Amino acid sequence: MQKLGSGVITTTHDVDCVEFDWGKIQFLSEPAVTDADRFSFGVVELSQGKGHARHNHPGSEEVIYVISGEGEQMVDDKPPVKVGPGASIYIPADVYHSTVNTGGETMKLIVVYSPAGPERLLREIPGAKVTPPAG
């Protein structure tokens, strides 16, 4: 991690890795890392054939951006739609949703929560394994 004026530069080697049975997430910007409190920003990897169960984020909006891989996105309990690289999904606060990797490779996503908060709750999910920074 490197300070740059009042900003911060982080890499995945600088932050915790939170692992689940469906994949992993690393938050490159969150209150505990960069002091940002209006949003958190993370990189998600969904394992082949896996995804996270239907859930919501009370009080926080979410944007998901697909970097690579193919999947299905459900929002508001509507039938899931196919998503792939370049897709951006906006999810209003409190709305139930899920993402499943349906492709033949790891699905990489960027997630942003506003305001920050869901990143703390993810660490408390039963079965979550938090690995300290590698760097």
Q: Model-predicted segments: where are they?
A:
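A short beta-to-alpha transition loop/helix N-cap that caps and shapes the active-site region
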Residues: 117-123
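A short, N-terminal "cap"/entry segment at the start of jelly-roll beta-barrel domains
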Residues: 1-39, 53, 124-135
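A generic "binding-loop/recognition-motif" signal
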Residues: 50, 59, 70, 79, ...
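Short acidic-glycine-tyrosine-enriched beta hairpin
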Residues: 77-93
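Short beta-strand His + acidic residue motifs that chelate non-heme Fe in jelly-roll/DSBH
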Residues: 53-55, 73-74, 91, 97-104
